[in-house]
C-alpha cells in the first residue's frame, strides 16, 4: 500500500467490528474508494468529525493497489461538515439520493474531477439551503451520461429530424415530438416546459444555477428521472423509493398534476 493524500466527500459509513468503520468516499484523485478507519468508533478518535456522512475532508490513506479493494486510513481532517443536511428530512433525502447514485457498485472508480466538483457543489448547496431540490434534480440529470442514459432533446425522437418547434416531450420514451409526428389523440405540452428541458440540456450543472427555476416543471422532471434511473438504467436506490412515496409522486396524483401543468400553454 502506498501513502496518498486525497480530498473526499463521505458517501457511506459502515460499522466494522467493535471500534472500526468502513468509509466510502468520492475523491478528487481516485474517484470512489473505500477505506477502513481503525478505532473510529472510539470516543477518543481524532478522525470522528472527518468521517461523518456528507462531510468534505482531507484524508491521508494507505491506498490499496487494487481499485475496489479496501484501503486504510491514516488521518482525516475535516474541511466542511455539511451537518445542516441532517436537520431537514427532505434535504437529507435529496443528498442521500445523490450519494446512492454514486454508490452503485461497478461505477465511479476512476478519477473524474468534473463529477467531484459537481458532487461537492450539490452537497454544499443542499447543506446551505441553496435550491436543494433543484440541485438534486440537476445532479441526476447531468449524471445520466455516466450510466449511458440519454433523453432526446435535440431532435424529434420519432422521425429523427430537428425542428424549430416541438409539440410535446414524450414522458414514456423521454424524447421530443415534432408537429409532423404528434398523433391526434396526444396532448400537446406547454412550450415553456420544452424550452426548460432544452435549456437544461444546453447547460451544465454549474451554468444552469443562474437561470430562473420552475418548481412545477422540476417536480415532473424529478419523477421522470427517478423512473428512468430505477426502470431504464436499473439501479437500486432506497432513498429514491422513499421519496416516491410522497403524495405528489403517487401515480394518480402525479398524472393529474402533470396534465394540469403541461397543457396550460401549448402551441
From Swiss-Prot:
Keywords: DNA damage, DNA recombination, DNA repair
Top-level taxon of the source organism: Bacteria
GO CC terms, sorted: bacterial nucleoid
Alphabetized Gene3D superfamilies for the sequence: Nucleic acid-binding proteins
Coiled-coil region: none
GO biological process, one term: DNA recombination
A family per Pfam: RecO_N
Transmembrane feature ranges: none
Function per UniProt: Involved in DNA repair and RecF pathway recombination.
Family per record: Belongs to the RecO family.
Protein name: DNA repair protein RecO
Organism: Mesoplasma florum (strain ATCC 33453 / NBRC 100688 / NCTC 11704 / L1) (Acholeplasma florum)
Gene transcribed to yield this protein: recO
